[in-house]
């Protein structure tokens, strides 16, 4: 028995970016024309019942959700964070615990919950970034021990609260040019595993997707029914990785077996094209044909690989209809 067996049994899941600069940004379609509101109000309005119901309709086995990304805003309370950055409850950390509320709904459908956290903290905000200890991300300033201790103490509070709630974590932004190596990644590993050693965790540095952006010859038409494998396969980021982070621009990476260097093979890629965040993350449309993803899913599952589909989530807690219907039909075909 392997610790990722349950993950493999789920086969596929959905990731969503729930962010201040996405759903709470009036310039984004996911804002639904509501405009920008205080963070606390924004989080209080999200319909977790609908999120869970639509995930169930699509047949997703698990859901991966961002706690934060770059901005200082968190989707749940965190007294440690408030103390370090000098904020009040509800200012940056919502008073509503969206994670607990969401999990209560997901459990009704046996949908597992995973959480996304980062390795670069709230760097987009000068005050919070400096308070945590890492703000100069774009000048490739190396992370410090002060930052690692502060930031993992924030993670520790969430970990202890969600010990029996979530099934695992996906940690982003562990770039080598920040100074990340296994010694520094161990801060996150020890923080999480000391709370729940059964959690499965992935550590990401965006290596595969960065290569794809840099190499023009990797550009291809994802509507083509005959996909070509990416010349740069997924890789294991850290010795502490239970499953591959698996970030890729497109679903055109393939395994050679269930495990890679002892870690469960897994891919994460956006369903939409570049109308959301960079690379299509959180986008609203579908860039693939049904036939393309049908064959892709079959191939990955034949190796006991796991697939996470990044989809756009609207402010109300609804998925884009085009994407939702596409995944419903895809699962019908796969389950026939």
Specify the residue positions occupied by each region the protein language model found:
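Mature catalytic domains of secreted/periplasmic carbohydrate-active enzymes
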Residues: 1-336
């Amino acid at each position: 028995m392997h610790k990722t067996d349950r993950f493999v049994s789920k086969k596929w899941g959905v990731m969503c970016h729930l962010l201040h600069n996405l759903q709470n940004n009036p310039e984004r379609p996911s804002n639904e024309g509501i405009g920008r509101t205080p963070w606390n109000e924004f989080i209080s309005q999200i319909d977790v019942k609908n999120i869970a119901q639509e995930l169930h309709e699509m047949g997703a086995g698990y859901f991966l959700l961002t706690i934060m990304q770059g901005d200082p805003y968190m989707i749940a309370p965190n007294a440690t964070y408030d103390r370090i950055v000098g904020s009040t409850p509800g200012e940056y950390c919502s008073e509503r615990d969206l994670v607990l509320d969401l999990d209560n709904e997901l459990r009704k459908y046996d949908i597992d919950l995973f959480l996304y956290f980062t390795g670069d903290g709230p760097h987009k905000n000068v005050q919070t970034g400096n308070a945590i200890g890492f703000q100069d991300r774009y000048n490739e300033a190396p992370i410090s021990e002060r930052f690692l201790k502060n930031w993992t103490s924030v993670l520790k509070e969430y970990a202890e609260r969600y010990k029996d709630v979530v099934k695992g974590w996906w940690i982003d932004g562990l770039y080598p040019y920040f100074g990340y190596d296994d010694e520094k990644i161990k801060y996150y590993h020890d923080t999480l595993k000391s709370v729940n050693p059964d959690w499965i965790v992935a550590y990401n540095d965006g290596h595969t997707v960065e290569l794809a952006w840099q190499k023009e010859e990797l550009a291809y038409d994802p509507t083509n029914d005959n996909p070509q494998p990416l010349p740069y396969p997924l890789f294991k980021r850290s010795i502490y990785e239970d499953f591959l982070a698996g970030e890729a621009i497109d679903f055109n990476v393939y395994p050679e077996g269930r495990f890679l260097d002892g870690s469960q093979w897994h891919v994460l890629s956006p369903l939409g094209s570049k109308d959301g965040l960079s690379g299509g993350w959180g986008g609203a449309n579908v860039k693939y044909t049904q036939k393309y993803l049908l064959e892709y899913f079959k191939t990955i599952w034949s190796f006991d690989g796991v697939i996470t589909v990044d989809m756009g989530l609207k402010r109300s807690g609804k998925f884009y209809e085009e994407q939702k219907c596409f995944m419903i039909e895809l699962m019908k075909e796969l389950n026939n």
